[in-house]
Regions:
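Juxtamembrane extracytoplasmic/periplasmic/luminal helical "stalk" adjacent to the first N-terminal
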Residues: 117-120, 191-223
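N-terminal signal-anchor/signal peptide hydrophobic helix marking the start
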Residues: 175-191
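Juxtamembrane segments at transmembrane-helix boundaries
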Residues: 1-177
Length: 223
C-alpha cells in the first residue's frame, strides 16, 4: 500500500509540476517514510534486511532496510528538486535582490549537505555491517551487496543532479552542463575512485581492529 501511495504521489507531482504539487509530494514521501519506520522495526526478527545482525547504527539508521529507505527518500527529494529546476530558476529571477542571494545560497549548499550525507552513511555502512562491498571478493557478494550498490548509485546520481541545479543558479548556467559527456566521464572517474579508496581503506581499518580484538582476547585467555 505504501508503494502504491508513492506511485500515486509521484504521478500527481509529475503531472502538475507546480510548487503546490512539489510541496504535497515532499510532505507525502515524508509521511510514508515515517510510516515505514515502525513497520520495518516490527520485522527485525523476521526479515534479515531489518535485522541489526546485518547492519546497525543509531536512530533512523538502525538497520540496512532503514538505511536503504532513507537513501531512497533523499533520492526522491533530489529528483523532485531537479524536475522543478525550470520553475525554481524562474522563481529566482522574480525574487528581490536580497532574497535572490539567499535563495541561491540555499541551492548551492544542498549539494554540500548531500555530499556529507553520502560520505557519513557510506562510512557507517562499511564500519557497522557484515556486508561485502569489495568487488574483488566477487564470490562473497550477495543480494545485500547489490542493494547497497544500487542505493548509493542513486545517491551519486542525486548528487550530480543537485550540482547541476546549483550550477543553474550561477553565471555559468548555459555555458557549462555537468550532464555533458566529458563532465559525466570525469564525475564517474571521481566517484569510482572515491568508492574504491573508501571501501579499501575503511575495510582495512575494520579488519585491523578485528584482528587486534582477537589478539587481545587470546592474550587474556593465555594469562
Amino acid at each position: 500500500s505504501l508503494l502504491f501511495a508513492l506511485v500515486a504521489l509521484y504521478s500527481y507531482f509529475l503531472g502538475k509540476k507546480s510548487f503546490l504539487s512539489f510541496g504535497i509530494f515532499l510532505i507525502g514521501i515524508t509521511v510514508l517514510r515515517l510510516l515505514a519506520f515502525p513497520i520495518g522495526n516490527s520485522m527485525r526478527l523476521d526479515v534479515p534486511l531489518f535485522s541489526p545482525n546485518l547492519y546497525a547504527d543509531s536512530g533512523i539508521f538502525s538497520s540496512l532496510g532503514n538505511l536503504l529507505l532513507n537513501n531512497l527518500y533523499v533520492f526522491l527529494f533530489v529528483l523532485a528538486v531537479y524536475i522543478m529546476r525550470k520553475q525554481i530558476a524562474k522563481l529566482k529571477r522574480e525574487l528581490p535582490v536580497a532574497l535572490k542571494y539567499i535563495f541561491t545560497a540555499v541551492l548551492v549548499i544542498l549539494p554540500v549537505i548531500a555530499g556529507v550525507y553520502i560520505h557519513e552513511t557510506f562510512q557507517s555502512l562499511i564500519n557497522n555491517s557484515n556486508i561485502t562491498l569489495e568487488i574483488y571478493r566477487i564470490e562473497e557478494l550477495d543480494i545485500y551487496s547489490i542493494l547497497c550498490y544500487v542505493s548509493y548509485g542513486l545517491l551519486f546520481i542525486a548528487f550530480l543532479l543537485l550540482l547541476q541545479v546549483a550550477l543553474m543558479m550561477t553565471s555559468l548556467s548555459g555555458r557549462i552542463s555537468f550532464l555533458r559527456t566529458k563532465y559525466l566521464l570525469v564525475y564517474i572517474f571521481i566517484i569510482s575512485a572515491y568508492t574504491l579508496v573508501a571501501i579499501s581503506y575503511l575495510g582495512y581499518k575494520k579488519e585491523e581492529a578485528r584482528c587486534r580484538m582477537w589478539t587481545n582476547r587470546l592474550s587474556v585467555e593465555r594469562d
